[in-house]
């Protein structure tokens, strides 16, 4: 069992890293093809698009995982009921997917004109709606395979989806140079819709192969009270996530509009959209990219945190939370140091954008707060505190919207950076405080952030000195720029690890390996 668990964890983590690398590469290429204004328009479309994705998939994905796990955990003689439940879940997914697609198609013109304030978004909104039914079907089948503890179908379908998306986007944009930004954004979203269809077809092929063994060859029969069980999961999850997504969409629509007020005499809407694209489409994806490497820590620790909570093992739960917070602190502080020292040359290399480099440098100190908040959010759900996590998330969105409206018309992008920093502080403090209180864990901020911060000071000092020495390399051709960044990043990381290892990082790494090494007998 442990061998299979570690194999699945390794497969999920490895595929997540590959997918994130591919997605990051695609974003970098898109930024250079579309430019700042084009990325701003693309991000605006994604803000509305994500709202309808949530409507189509959020509730049915959770319902599929939970209900199929319940049905498949029963006796083998009841597998016909499991097949019947899956059919009902697929029907519910199709209904939600078609409804979301129809609603997005019907409101595309209204959303572009009134919500986004840019009619160029109409085509992209319309074509992206065509992928909704396929996404809903994929969400249900993904939940089925998770319930079966089969990760390979999900991994393969996601890799295929990303490959098809990259190929189609590259084909479309290389043949449409010089066309309007709105048309090119429409082609990118069209490629995404096609890739979603391909992914769903892959999942269906895996399902056909897996169905006989999963259901023991039994025909579908009506499961016990399917409508009530589905509805009890669907409406609170769907309602909560759609509300959170709607608030997030509202914030993203307000940012360019409020920036345009500040920039009314300096380019107005066009410059506002460009600045928005440089932050949301260039800088923030780079800042959040390293978080994918924490996936292995999450995969290993979250099930144990949930188990310790369910069994009432308070000491074990406290130890696991302490380890999670300590390791996340070290990793996030290292990532923050790297972006603070090397963010400007990295942005110049990837995007030829000084503004994106400024955003990376400014937000880098907040990375420990961002990463801790994300890990704590997952842990809160693992100990049954998801309502509190959702409540803090909603309040954070409301406060961010208020901050955008109050600060951006007066201070421009600096005001938005302040909103992001204050938001990170609030969500991290609120979620972490609630988790520690509800679990009875004593705070140890010196261990979680103090020791990493000490190592960060030494690494940052070494990194800044090295950056001055390598300044000529950043003004040279691409190979030398890559070499300078690689040497600088590796050297900074090395100094951090050498400083952090005796401060507790070595102790935690050894304990984590001892607890999860292959061949260790399960307690």
Language-model features and meaning:
Residues 1-22, 80, 84, 221-245, ...:
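N-terminal membrane topogenesis motif
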Residues 97-242, 246:
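Hydrophobic transmembrane helix module of multi-pass membrane transport proteins
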Residues 58-73, 287-312, 321:
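Helix-loop junctions and terminal segments of transmembrane helices
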Residues 87-114, 318-369, 401-402:
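Alpha-helical transmembrane segments of multi-pass membrane transport and lipid-handling proteins
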Residues 465-523:
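Membrane-proximal transmembrane or re-entrant/amphipathic helices at the cytosolic face
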Residues 19, 27, 58-65, 127-146, ...:
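Short runs within selected transmembrane alpha-helices of multi-pass transporters and secretion channels
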Residues 30-51, 181, 185-189, 225-233, ...:
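Interfacial/gating helices of multi-pass transporter permease domains
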Residues 4-62, 101, 105, 131-132, ...:
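Signature of the first transmembrane helix
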């Amino acid at each position: 069992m442990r061998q299979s668990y570690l194999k699945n964890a390794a497969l999920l983590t490895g595929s997540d890293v590959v997918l994130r690398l591919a997605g990051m590469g695609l974003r970098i290429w898109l930024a250079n093809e579309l430019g700042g204004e084009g990325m701003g328009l693309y991000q605006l479309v994604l803000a509305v698009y994500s709202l309808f994705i949530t409507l189509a998939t959020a509730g049915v994905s959770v319902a599929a995982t939970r209900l199929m796990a319940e049905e498949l955990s029963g006796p083998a003689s009841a597998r016909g009921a499991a097949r019947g439940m899956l059919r009902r879940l697929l029907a519910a997914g199709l209904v939600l997917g078609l409804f979301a697609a129809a609603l997005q198609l019907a409101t595309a013109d209204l959303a572009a004109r009134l919500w986004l304030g840019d009619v160029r978004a109409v085509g992209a909104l319309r074509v992206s709606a065509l992928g909704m039914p396929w996404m809903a079907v994929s969400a249900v089948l993904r939940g089925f395979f998770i319930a079966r503890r089969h990760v390979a179908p999900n991994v393969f379908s996601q890799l295929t989806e990303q490959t098809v998306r990259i190929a189609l986007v590259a084909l479309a944009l290389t043949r449409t140079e010089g066309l309007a930004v709105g048309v090119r954004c429409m082609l990118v979203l069209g490629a995404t819709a096609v890739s979603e269809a391909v992914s769903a077809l892959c999942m269906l092929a895996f399902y056909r192969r897996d169905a006989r063994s999963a259901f023991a060859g039994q025909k579908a029969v009506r499961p016990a009270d399917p409508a009530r069980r589905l509805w009890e999961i669907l409406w609170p999850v769907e309602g909560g996530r759609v509300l959170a997504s709607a608030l997030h969409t509202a914030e993203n629509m307000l940012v360019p509009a409020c920036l345009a007020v500040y920039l009314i005499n300096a380019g107005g809407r066009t410059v506002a959209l460009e600045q928005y694209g440089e932050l949301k489409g260039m800088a923030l994806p780079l800042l959040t990219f390293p978080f994918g490497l924490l996936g292995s820590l999450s995969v290993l620790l979250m099930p144990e945190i949930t188990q310790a909570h369910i069994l009432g093992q308070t000491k074990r739960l406290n130890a696991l939370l302490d380890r999670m917070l300590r390791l996340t602190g070290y990793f996030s502080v290292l990532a923050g140091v790297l972006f603070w020292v090397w963010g400007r040359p990295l942005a110049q290399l990837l995007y030829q954008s000084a503004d994106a480099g400024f955003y990376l440098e400014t937000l880098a100190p907040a990375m420990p707060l961002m990463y801790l908040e994300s890990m704590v959010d997952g842990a809160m759900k693992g100990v049954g505190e998801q309502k509190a996590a959702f409540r803090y998330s909603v309040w954070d969105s409301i406060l961010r919207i208020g901050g955008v409206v109050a600060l951006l018309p007066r201070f421009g992008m600096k005001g938005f950076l302040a909103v992001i920093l204050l938001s990170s502080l609030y969500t991290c403090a609120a979620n972490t405080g609630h988790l520690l209180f509800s679990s009875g864990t004593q705070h140890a901020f010196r261990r979680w952030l103090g020791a990493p911060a000490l190592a960060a000071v030494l690494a940052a000092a070494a990194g800044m000195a090295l950056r001055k020495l390598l300044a000529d390399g950043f003004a040279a051709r691409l190979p030398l720029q890559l070499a300078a960044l690689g040497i600088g990043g590796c050297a900074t990381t090395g100094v951090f690890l050498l400083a952090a290892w005796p401060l507790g990082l070595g102790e935690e790494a050894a304990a984590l390996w001892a607890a999860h090494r292959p061949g260790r007998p399960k307690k």
